[in-house]
Amino acid sequence: MKRTLLAALIATAGLALASGASAQNFFRINTGGVAGTYYPIGGLIANAISQPAVPNLVATAVASNGSVANVNAIQGGGAESGFSQADVAYWAYTGTGTFEGKPKVTDLRLIANLYPESFHLVARKGANIKSVGDLKGKRVSLDEPGSGTLVNARAILAAYGVSEKDIKAEFLKPNAAGEKVKDNSLDAYFFVGGYPAGAIAELAATGGVDIVSIGGPEAEKLVKQFGFYAVDTIPADTYKGVGAVKTLAVGAQWVTSAKQDTTLVYNITKALWSDNARKALDSGHAKGKAIVRAGAIAGAGIPLHAGAEKFYKEVGLLK
């Protein structure tokens, strides 16, 4: 009896030691506002790479202010990784664009290019906004400070000859902007993200909004000026009652710090492109189908993390 009890105690102690030896790793993915596309996609990826896909890993999607805030959080150690627009990541790494005059974020590294983010200019029906130029004199939200959308909105306004002084500018999260459009206290707002965006779909279902085209020579000039931007079309009926809309797009990227462990990021990258992750992405969000391994290093702009680079070499995406 005593021997049996002793054996049980030894086994229990051994399990406790083993449990302590395999401590959990927590890995945050900073995303964006809960009404956008980053947050649900981040949740799908976090679930796909967590234990058992990567042993002892607990990944979580964290709501945030968006691209600029995510890069700053990674740099400051407030997040292990995050989503960023390709232009914001490049500007941060090189100390140019919106990061001009600030220290370069030289440790910023790419895990994967994810999907194209489409520029949305959402306008209240009855506000008589048919083009970007019609925003003059209107109440317009450019998104909140720290977001990539704010950077893009300012670039778009400038391209069409509209200054912030020409509009009644507000700086709101997309869901808050949508609520103000709904109660007629805002005329339009910018959103950059994968379609369909849930908050915009809800607005469109009421029949109260239009998606305004961002096209023409002004858009073509932006594409030539910024290599990250591409001509895009939001297909008809993506949003109820809205026809096909010409617009622009920029790549959404998953970025991290060079300081993150090489083996850990290798395993995370491998899990991202596993069959289980594929099923989750395909079934979990309309934009999930656009996240494909073949495009993982397209339009990189910043260096790959050593762990991600190792994986892409193994599967033949890199030589």
Region roles according to the model:
Residues 172, 176, 182-183, 193-211, ...:
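An extracytoplasmic/periplasmic, membrane-proximal ligand-sensing/linker region
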